[in-house]
From Swiss-Prot:
Subcellular location: Cytoplasm
Main location: cytoplasm
A Pfam family that the UniProt record links to this protein: MurB_C
GO cellular component: cytosol
Record protein name field: UDP-N-acetylenolpyruvoylglucosamine reductase
Gene encoding the protein: murB
Active-site residues, Swiss-Prot/TrEMBL: 182, 231 (proton donor), 301
Length: 322
């Protein structure tokens, strides 16, 4: 069991007094994540801007755990909470999207992906329509090379601006990001703050039509009005995660308040009162059944974080097969 957030702040004894952002101890992560489940952040920090974030990083000892979140999609928080600091990049300080030249946009890491798509439409830049259908933010898209409809984030990235744990600025090229399918090999200690994107001049009517098609597809096949973190598992090579989940009989499967969506069975939903334990147990049950059925090991696309409550540890594949 972790100590209180107030106790952690007291240990730092005024080192954070010059910050302009908001420090909130013992904040429920269920208020932040799209699953609306999970335990508290020991301390939540919402920096005002990149300068404020840099000052915070310089003040916090590196041995204190630190986790960065954006708009809260694609996150499953365990019920024991998240120790140390959770840094939430706010839309006010990190959510702007602006056109910087004929073919380029600069976007803050907390900007919703849909805002990037809208800005690209306004600028007459093609190649961003896929963001209109991704329920997440730019920072997460950069970290996991988010993609949809046959397009990936890496195809649009020119350079990424980031801070390290010492508060120093780094500028990473596309190659530095080390992109692969739903993955970047950039150091996990780097905090992305903004990105420079490159688009292709296009006709606004064509761009709008592509965005409408993405939106229609999403509303037709995905549970967009449910409490969900998006796609639960990465697609295995040569097949789709949802197909393997369906073949294993897991469509609609429930654990407590968690359920694999009837509409799209690679989407896990909180039906109303799911705990982090319910959600993760459901996910590991699905992994076990898929492996038993087809020999395929599904890998989580949703990021799981935090501590288990005492006695609620969950083994991979529920310990059945590994």
């Amino acid at each position: 069991m972790m100590e209180s957030g107030e106790a952690l702040l007291k240990k730092l004894d005024g080192r954070l007094s010059g910050l302009r952002g908001r420090l909130t101890p013992d904040t429920g992560m269920d208020k932040i994540t799209w699953f609306r489940a999970g335990g508290p952040a020991q301390v939540l920090f919402q920096p005002s801007d990149e300068e404020d974030l840099s000052a915070f990083l310089k003040a916090v000892p590196e041995e204190i755990p630190l986790l960065v979140v954006g708009i809260g999609s694609n996150l499953l928080v365990r019920d024991g909470g998240v120790p140390g600091f959770v840094v939430r990049l706010s839309a006010k300080g990190f959510g702007e999207v602006e056109q910087v030249c004929d073919t380029q946009l600069r976007a803050g890491a907390a900007a919703p992906d849909k805002r990037v798509a809208a800005a690209a439409l306004e600028a007459g830049l093609a190649g961003f329509h896929f963001y209109h259908g991704i329920p997440g933010g730019v920072g997460g898209a950069l970290r996991m090379n988010a993609g949809a409809n046959g397009v990936e984030t890496r195809e649009r990235v020119v350079e990424v601006r980031a801070l390290d744990r010492k508060g120093e600025v780094h500028v990473l090229s596309n190659a530095d990001m080390g992109y692969a399918y739903r993955h970047s090999s950039a150091s996990p200690d780097l905090i992305f703050t903004s990105v420079l994107f490159e688009g292709v001049p296009g006709e606004r009517d064509d761009i709008r039509r592509a965005m409408d098609e993405v939106q229609h597809h999403r509303e037709t096949v995905q549970p967009v009005r449910e409490k969900t973190g998006g796609s639960t598992f990465k697609n295995p090579e040569g097949t789709s995660a949802w197909k393997e989940i369906d073949k294993a009989g897991c469509r609609g499967l429930r654990v407590g308040g968690a359920q694999m969506s009837e509409m799209h069975c690679n989407f896990m939903i909180n039906t109303g009162n799911a705990t982090g334990h319910d959600l993760e147990t459901l996910g590991e049950t699905v992994r076990a059944r898929v492996f038993e059925n087809s020999g395929i090991r599904l890998h989580w696309e949703i990021k799981r974080l935090g501590l288990f409550r005492e006695g609620e540890q969950i083994e991979e594949f529920l310990g059945k097969i590994i």
